[in-house]
Amino acid sequence: MLKGKSVALIAIVVMMLLFIVSCNSIKTKEEFEEELPQDVVSEGEAEDVEDKNVRETVVYYQNDAGYLVPVMRRIPWEEGIAKATLRMTIDSPEIQQDLMAMGLKALLPAGTQIRGMSIKDGLAKLDLSKEAMECENAVAEHNMVQGVALTLAEFDSIDRVQFMFEGKIVDKLKYGTDVSKPIEPQDVNLEIGSNASSKGAKVTVFFHSKPDAVYDYIVPVTRIISADSASIETAIQEVLNGPSDDSLSMDIPAGTRLLGVKTDNGVVSINFSKEFGNLAQLPQSEPLVLKSIIMTAKQFPGVEKVKILVEGKEYDGGEVSVSAFANEY
């Protein structure tokens, strides 16, 4: 009798469990639809989600001619992201392979280690291993110091860098670069223009790589000019004057003159003479020339869009939103 009651009790328990499970498995149409995969996003949305986990920042490299070249890189967010960014400037097989696609070179010599970095009140104290002192020549040494300072200054919390090597501050590096005091980012690729005076204004103008080069990029050059103050007009005129170094180029058609510059609600209209229209016949150079003009105008506050005119009429494809970065890879 007791055995029969036990069997009955077990049966009742099993039935109750089955009832509970079946109740939980019954869902409304709305509940069922909510369980369908909802995390499938479009390609653009996926990029937006991914972008939350990376920082777009400018990293400086150097080319064979000794110019510093800014490149936008996407750095995965992590604690100490400034240090992670700086690691992308160290010569290594991985970085070499990456830079090969750009035709550029790393700033910090192979074997360099970042021993430590602290940031306080805008000052980054950067401790590098002794390998960082072994740049191949004076130009590379100068580029290393300025390029690192420029790269770190892309972070709002950093405006100057105190270099240390093996935990100590040194007065000068192998080729004479003074690093005894904190380094502030200075004028990138500084040159002195023709007819300039020591009191002349500074403008940053962009030139591009040779049209027959394997790699296309634009290079900022800080030029001291004869004018007392810098303006969009004086800067664009320097673009027309072209680079002083034959390793760079500016393929604006010969005879092009600047007729005027106007600004209206963030839109800058740059009016060139009729010769500029011949740029359309240079398909390889055209995008580089246009971007060089745009980036040159961008340095001035309030510029949101650049409209390029030829004899007062809009150049085909001449209204372009201001690019955020000079070079992107």
Place the predicted regions along the sequence by residue.
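Bimodal "functional hotspot" detector
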Residues: 2-329
